[in-house]
C-alpha cells in the first residue's frame, strides 16, 4: 500500500466527514498526506471541520501503524483499496462532485463495466415484479452490460441473481465491505464477488443505517449510464437513485405497472423526469441509452467548490 493510499484510508475514518468534506480538505492542502500533517488551527480555518474533527485528524496521523495493519488485513481478505486518483477508478463515478475518494473493492472492476445499468426497486415487490427484475437483469447481462444494484431484499437481489445467470453484476453496499446487509444475502454477495465486484465507501465494520443506505444510492447512479426502476411505491430509496441519475444527466426508465400499489410510484417517477416503459421495452431502451455518450462533466455536476454543504457522513 502506498503512502498516499494509507493517508486516504486514515482520512476515511474521520468521524462525521463525508466525501465532499474530505475532497475539499485534500484539495486545500494538496494531498491526503499533507492534510493529515496540517496543524489543527489550519484545519479549523478551512471551515469544513469542527475543532473536534480537526483534533481527530491529528490523532489519525499518529496512528499510522493501525492503518498499515488494517490495510494488510483487508488485502488478506481480498479487498482492494481504490482511490479517486487511481487510473482504474470507475470513470462515470468520478464525474460526481461527491464521488467517494476511497472505495473498498472485493472482486474485480473491468473496463467493460463502463457500460453498466442500475436496476433498482422496492424491497417488497409483487411476484411479478421480482420476476421482472430477474428477467431484466439477465437480459442486460446477456447483452454484455454490467448490472449494478444495492444487494437489498426484493428487486435488488432478483436483479443480481438474474445478471449472474448471464454475466456480471456489481453490488454497492450501504455498510462496510465486511458486513453484508442483509445477512441472508451473504451467499449472493460471495457469488457477485467471484464474477463481478462488491463496493463500499465505508470503513470496515460500519453497520448499515438509513443515512449510509441513502448515500449508497448516489454511487449506484454514478457507476451507471442509465437507471431502471423495476417496481416501487411512491416513496423509498429508488427515488434517491433516480434523482441523482437525472441530476447527472443520465436517463431513468420506470417500468409501468397498473396495480394501484405501484402505479403511484410510476406516476411520481414520471413527474420527476423518468421515461415510463413496458417491461418488454426496458432492456432495448437501456441498451440504447448505455451506448450514448454521457454529458460532459460541466453539464452533469457542479464543480466541487460549488457543491452544497449537505454531505453524507457517518
Question: For each predicted feature, which ranges?
Answer:
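Short, small/acidic-rich helices and loops at N termini and domain boundaries
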Residues: 1-86, 272
